[in-house]
């Protein structure tokens, strides 16, 4: 077998070939070693070997500094190894853990792969028989055990056990050679020594040199310890004197007295009090100059500064809560009502286990500020824990005190910052966490958010239980897809959609302009921004679901005005639509209506993104060919299948549409979805793709004031899709007047803002025929004749 093409287009490895990975150190049989894959070719080699379950051959480079070694710069003898694990390190570099199996000699190289592939033969171990080999085996074992005893630091118990339990002379020689501090060429020399007696002699000779160094090092260390004896004796006498003073009640440090009083007054549970007293006694026995003294003192300070008790909470006033929510946020009526329900349950059952709210929506729609409003309504402190980019479980649970610079996790740190155990804690960007080599932080959050477990949350640093049951947890996320299922199951998801243009104008008038006036040292009497200017700012200078970019643009306008007042201008300034371009420059958002072209083969679709809805143009054209379907625009697998389905549906309806069937065999059809640099996926473009193909093949244009969404089936049914509200709002913002939607999504109509429904005509589709009737411009004359003329 010379290699075949796999399903994904990659060439498979021949059965008698192996993948070769150059390494900078020698890997011996029977030994497990991690390897960093620092070249793209090495990554591709390891991935294909894993995928096809091929072993790797690890071969030493002759020049370890060579950036991309070829066959000529590699040794012929290497080690056949199995890949045990493939992980990505904290630095982003892939790592593999490999276990050597046996020696392997390369005979010839196989070309045609993006990495090194070779053929060769396995080198079996020779028979270990005879008294000479047995004597060398026992001598090498005694040398290795002596070397392990002479090491400055205690060796791992597994290594000692491996030396003592080596089953064969060959295995022992390879194990010792692997851990010897030798240069790579010396290790390669041992690897290439097949004769067992010669190999044992070489390893024993190298180990004997190392033993001499270790013996000399041990003697020097012994003399150093003797010279330090007097100093240690003085330190011991000082410690004894301090102990005598403590027994007599003399010289007690004021700091210890303060800590003892703080422990008694902190309101800690009895278990925690006992632990604190134990650490306090340990602190009293420790000299202040010792490094351990600072660690124990810091630990005790953390214990006494945490809010162990729960103050009596003020009753929740629902009318006040409504006022605060309306004062801080415009719109979001359903969200506010759900928050009021949440607060009502908290008022009636303060000790109850209320659900954990998770606000999901695009950036800038007010997720974090909603949490702050909840804290104001409950009269509790608000703390925010940012989880974006967290990939270490210790960020949640804390580090054990054995580590230098250890601290509690973010949860306990936030509790200390709040100063109250019943605070409102926002877990921000909970969807941005990721698992790393140090554990999965989302798994640690399962305990934090579970009411059955968080009554005794145990931080690794504190090592005592802390009750989190009175904390009001609120989470935020931009999308749900990246939140693990068990974690998502512990939260009640509340979706926040993007704002309409009218809502953005209201928010700007009520909140953003006032906030930016204060930030720039101006007053409403000095500057006025006309409503028409705000509308132009929203439509032509920002494109977002939230209002962050809008606030930045308002800030730019006001900073321009602030310069004028700082230079002595005194007259009030009024900013209208005509003033925007001189200050902000030309509009940065193109008019989507102007981008449309009323030519056959172009349809306007609608898409959902994590930052709101977008309109999507589907372009189709045909060229002479042999019936291929060409798809471009970074389309995902699902979207590609939608295009195939759309083409098959059009082929099946060719006669009814007046399309010559032979046209499909004589032409290539190309579907493109701008922008080409943006990845796209999902089934909701099925109707738009079908309409673009029908428009192309019948020479009838799709109405330029119409956008559409929906999944299509081979039977011509229009299936429901998600994100209806966001898509319809995006269509209205882009100037569309008619929107074609799946009839099975009619229940989502109530989520569409009233002002948007008043400006759009919503047409509900059961089948593709409904879309053809509503979406294509009527043409005079016989469509079949038009198509024949176009084909000719």
From Swiss-Prot:
Where are the catalytic residues? Answer: 684, 727
Reaction equation(s) it catalyzes: Hydrolysis of proteins in presence of ATP
* GO CC entries: cytoplasm
Per the entry, what induces it?
By heat shock.
Q: Known SMART domains for this protein?
A: AAA (SM00382), LON (SM00464)
Domain of life, per lineage = Bacteria
E.C. number: 3.4.21.53
Residues covered by the Lon proteolytic domain: 597-778
Cross-referenced PANTHER family: ATP DEPENDENT LON PROTEASE FAMILY MEMBER
The molecule here is called Lon protease
From which source organism is this entry? Phenylobacterium zucineum (strain HLK1)
Name the gene for this chain: lon
């Amino acid at each position: 077998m010379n290699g075949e093409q796999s399903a994904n287009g990659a060439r498979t490895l021949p059965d008698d070939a192996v993948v070769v990975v150059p390494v900078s150190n020698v890997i011996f049989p029977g030994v497990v070693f991690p390897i960093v894959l620092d070249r793209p070719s090495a990554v591709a080699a390891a991935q294909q070997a894993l995928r096809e379950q091929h072993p790797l051959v690890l071969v030493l480079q002759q020049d370890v500094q060579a950036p991309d070694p070829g066959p000529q710069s590699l040794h012929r003898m290497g080690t056949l190894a199995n890949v045990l694990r493939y992980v990505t390190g904290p630095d982003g570099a892939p790592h593999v853990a490999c276990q050597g199996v046996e020696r392997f000699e390369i005979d010839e190289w196989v070309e045609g792969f993006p990495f090194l592939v070779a053929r060769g033969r396995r080198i079996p171990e020779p028979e270990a028989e005879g008294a000479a080999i047995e004597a060398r085996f026992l001598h090498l074992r005694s040398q290795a055990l002596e070397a392990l005893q002479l090491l400055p630091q205690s060796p791992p118990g597994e290594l000692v056990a491996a030396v003592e339990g080596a089953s064969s002379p060959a295995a022992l020689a390879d194990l010792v050679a692997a851990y010897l501090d030798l240069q790579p060429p010396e290790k390669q020399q041992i690897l290439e020594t097949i004769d067992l007696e010669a190999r044992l002699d070489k390893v024993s000779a190298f180990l004997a040199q190392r033993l001499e160094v270790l013996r000399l090092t041990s003697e020097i260390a012994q003399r150093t310890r003797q010279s330090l004896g007097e100093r240690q004796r003085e330190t011991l006498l000082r410690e004894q004197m301090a102990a005598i003073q403590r027994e007599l009640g003399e010289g007690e440090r004021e700091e210890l007295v303060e800590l003892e009083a703080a422990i008694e007054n902190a309101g800690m549970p009895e278990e925690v009090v006992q632990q604190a007293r134990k650490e306090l006694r340990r602190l009293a026995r420790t000299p202040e100059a010792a490094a351990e003294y600072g660690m124990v003192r810091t630990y005790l300070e953390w214990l006494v500064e945490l809010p162990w008790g729960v103050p009596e909470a003020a009753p929740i006033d629902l009318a006040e809560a409504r006022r605060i929510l309306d004062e801080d946020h415009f719109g979001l009526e359903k969200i506010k009502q759900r928050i009021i329900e949440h607060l009502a349950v908290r008022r009636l059952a303060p000790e109850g286990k209320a659900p954990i709210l998770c606000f999901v929506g695009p950036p800038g729609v007010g997720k974090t500020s909603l949490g702050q409003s909840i804290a104001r309504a409950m009269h509790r402190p608000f703390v925010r824990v940012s989880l974006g980019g967290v990939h270490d479980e210790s960020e949640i649970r804390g580090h054990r005190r054995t580590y230098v610079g250890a601290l509690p996790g973010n949860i306990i740190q936030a509790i200390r910052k709040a100063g109250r155990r019943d605070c409102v804690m926002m877990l921000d960007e909970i969807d941005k966490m990721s698992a790393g080599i140090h554990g999965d932080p989302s798994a640690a959050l399962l305990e934090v958010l579970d009411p059955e477990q968080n009554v005794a949350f145990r931080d690794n640093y504190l090592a005592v239980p802390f009750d989190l049951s009175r904390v009001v947890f609120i989470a935020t996320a931009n999308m749900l897809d990246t939140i693990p299922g068990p974690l998502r199951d512990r939260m009640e998801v509340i979706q926040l959609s993007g704002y309409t243009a009218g809502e953005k104008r209201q928010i700007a008038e009520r909140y953003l302009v006032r906030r930016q006036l204060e930030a720039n040292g101006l007053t409403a009497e000095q500057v006025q921004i006309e409503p028409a200017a705000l509308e132009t700012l929203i439509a032509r200078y920002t494109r977002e679901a939230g209002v962050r970019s809008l606030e930045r643009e308002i800030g730019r306008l006001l900073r321009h005005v602030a310069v004028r007042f700082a230079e002595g201008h005194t007259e009030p300034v009024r900013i209208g639509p005509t003033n925007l371009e001189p200050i902000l420059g030309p509009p940065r958002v193109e008019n989507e209506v102007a981008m449309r072209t009323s030519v056959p083969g172009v349809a306007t679709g609608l898409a959902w993104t994590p930052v709101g809805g977008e309109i999507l143009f589907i372009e189709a054209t045909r060229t002479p060919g042999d019936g291929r379907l060409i798809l471009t625009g970074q389309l995902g697998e699902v979207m590609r299948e939608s295009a195939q389905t759309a083409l098959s549906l059009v082929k099946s309806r060719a006669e009814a549409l007046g399309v010559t069937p032979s046209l499909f065999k004589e032409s290539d059809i190309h579907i493109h979805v701008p922008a080409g640099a943006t990845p796209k996926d999902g089934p909701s473009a099925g109707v738009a793709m079908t309409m673009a193909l029908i428009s192309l093949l019948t020479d009838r244009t799709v109405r330029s004031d119409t956008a559409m969404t929906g999944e299509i089936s081979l039977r011509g049914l229009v299936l429901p899709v998600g994100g209806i509200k966001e898509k319809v709002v995006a269509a209205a913002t882009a100037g569309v007047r008619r929107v074609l939607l799946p009839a099975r999504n009619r229940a989502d109509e109530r989520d569409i803002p009233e002002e948007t429904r008043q400006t759009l005509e919503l047409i509900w589709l059961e089948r593709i025929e409904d879309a053809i009737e509503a979406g294509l411009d009527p043409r005079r004359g016989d469509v079949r004749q038009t198509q024949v003329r176009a084909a000719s």
